[in-house]
Amino acid sequence: MSTAEDITQERVVDIMRDERFVMLSTATADGKVVSHPMTPQEVTDGANVWFLLGLQGDQADAIRVNPHVNLAFAETGSWLSVSGVAEFVEDRSKVAELWDGQLDEYFTGPDDPNLGLLKFVGQSAQYWGVPGGGMVAAVKIMASKVTGSEPPGQMGTVEL
């Protein structure tokens, strides 16, 4: 696998914007790493991500204790891991702006007192990818084993 020269902040942001779901990993007070599926409400050009979440619960408690978190994005043939810091933001107008009717299942509306606004500030990202994704990637990897050539794909790290 070669080092990717074209893994830039812009590319990271594009990948983040393309994914509907992400795993948000936190560390609990006793040191356990726990991941939760989340839906990014907005991804900024600066690699910051806005989420809406419940203010009462294990996930919010873990972030209050240790705001250093990780976001994991995956699609067929590529993976992105972004580390950063999460912070709770008091901004009801931003909550209303980001409100999605699909959240009705979890909250009574954008004014629900348990509904919180979380801003993730990305600091560093790691990317692994194989062109063509899924089956094409598997064939290319097997071919590299048979021929002894370098496996296809790229990896890279970028500070955000």
Model-derived regions: residue spans:
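A short mixed-secondary-structure module that forms the rim of ligand-binding clefts
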Residues: 41-77
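N-terminal leader/targeting segments and the immediate start of mature chains
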Residues: 1-20, 157
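A positional/architectural concept
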Residues: 31-37
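Charged, gly/pro-rich active-site loop segments
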Residues: 1-4, 85-160
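Histidine- and/or cysteine-centered catalytic micro-motif in compact active-site loops
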Residues: 27-29, 54-56, 74-76, 83-87
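A short, Trp-centered hydrophobic/proline-enriched beta-strand micro-motif
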Residues: 14-30, 69-73
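Structural motif
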Residues: 48, 68, 79, 85, ...
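Hydrophobic/aromatic beta-strand elements that line small-molecule binding cavities or substrate pockets
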Residues: 38-41, 86-87
